[in-house]
Amino acid sequence: MLKVEMLSTGDEVLHGQIVDTNAAWLADFFFHQGLPLSRRNTVGDNLDDLVTILRERSQHADVLIVNGGLGPTSDDLSALAAATAKGEGLVLHEAWLKEMERYFHERGRVMAPSNRKQAELPASAEFINNPVGTACGFAVQLNRCLMFFTPGVPSEFKVMVEHEILPRLRERFSLPQPPVCLRLTTFGRSESDLAQSLDTLQLPPGVTMGYRSSMPIIELKLTGPASEQQAMEKLWLDVKRVAGQSVIFEGTEGLPAQISRELQNRQFSLTLSEQFTGGLLALQLSRAGAPLLACEVVPSQEETLAQTAHWITERRANHFAGLALAVSGFENEHLNFALATPDGTFALRVRFSTTRYSLAIRQEVCAMMALNMLRRWLNGQDIASEHGWIEVIESMTLSV
């Protein structure tokens, strides 16, 4: 199998001052192209360290994606490191210099002399175009390894990988068929509980079951070679059966997007009233394009379940909304949820059995509970569901 690695560069990445989203994106993107990364490294803005690791990985990797260090400043050292590792100099790429000058001229700006550095490439480098920025990429062959050097700006990096680097890899190597990856996301059951229930399943050859916990959800993944797809799809039915009512969606689209689509398909508008969740519901649903009407975030206050239910019923009527969803304030370890619908208003009072989790996590969990309440009603299910450390202690229904 082709050995593909990634090298992230930059002091800010090494020291944790920024999150390396490029590495996460590349690992996921290449995995679905049948090119799983075998190693990832990070090095700071130090020429000797860069040269050392380029020479080291050139003896082990078939392909190395180097990210960052192609800018115009003194700490952008990737081109010089590549040239030094190869024992050659930098040469000016005249065509790219003219392209950069045009780029600045069209925007009514004068190109700084320091930008000239971005057109200086190792003598043996293959130029790689950057259609959305001033940092061109390049490729060099060092020992057994084909190295691609890419800009750190995420939008530029992704375009270059998708439209320049992947086609070159397909031309030069015989790439394997992408793996099959079946995913579902659960809410309300712990990772250990799910694993205990699923560990008895017999997996086909080369197939693995993976778990990813990201509070408040657990993602289950069944991954394997394309040759085992039929067996995997049969096994997937058992996985879904075991996960049961805790499954909130399949695939990677996300619950807000699926709810948004269902609301649009059924021509339901939605109004929100949030206290404890502080606008998380509105943020998540608006990003997914949900048909929202008036959304409010109000100060937390103690309410009975009946008060919350009557308030959201009135709010739905006042805003002529199809649906209305409320999350009350968090008082004395208790919280209310209420959903007003054409069929009536359904309300739940819950109790937190632990307070060891941070405020942010508790807000995320409650936002997910509210979304799941809405999902379950849209699917014709009982709206009540529990989380491991949240107990439903009271329910109420108001007739239309």
UniProtKB/Swiss-Prot annotation:
Mind telling me which Pfam families this protein's record contains? MoCF_biosynth
HAMAP family listed in its UniProt record: CinA_B
Q: Which family does it belong to?
A: Belongs to the CinA family.
Q: What is this protein called?
A: CinA-like protein
| Organism this protein belongs to | Escherichia coli (strain 55989 / EAEC)
Q: What is the lineage of its organism?
A: Bacteria, Pseudomonadati, Pseudomonadota, Gammaproteobacteria, Enterobacterales
